[in-house]
């Protein structure tokens, strides 16, 4: 199960970025939200020069899986 509705519609890096920032807003505390927002921004800077479409899709899939894991982690703690 994806952390937010619309995960299946994410096709581009910009859509992924916006999706992940929306996921961050669902996290329980401001400190945790800021931590993951920073991680999202750093990941986008690291992968900004990626131009292989297959690799981009792989990164998108993995980022959504990671977001799902993080959302479930904090859901179980509360």
Swiss-Prot record:
Fetch the Pfam families from UniProt. Answer: Complex1_LYR
Q: Which cysteines are joined by disulfide bonds?
A: none
What family does this belong to? Answer: Belongs to the complex I LYR family. LYRM9 subfamily.
- In Swiss-Prot or TrEMBL terms, this protein is called LYR motif-containing protein 9
Per the UniProt record, the source organism is Rattus norvegicus
């Amino acid at each position: 199960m994806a952390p937010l509705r619309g995960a299946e519609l994410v096709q581009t890096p910009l859509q992924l970025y916006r999706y992940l920032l929306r996921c961050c807003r669902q996290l329980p505390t401001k400190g945790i939200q800021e931590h993951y927002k920073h991680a999202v921004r750093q990941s986008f800077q690291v992968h900004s020069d990626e131009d292989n479409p297959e690799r981009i899709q792989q990164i998108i899939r993995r980022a959504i899986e990671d977001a799902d894991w993080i959302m479930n982690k904090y859901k179980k703690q509360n």
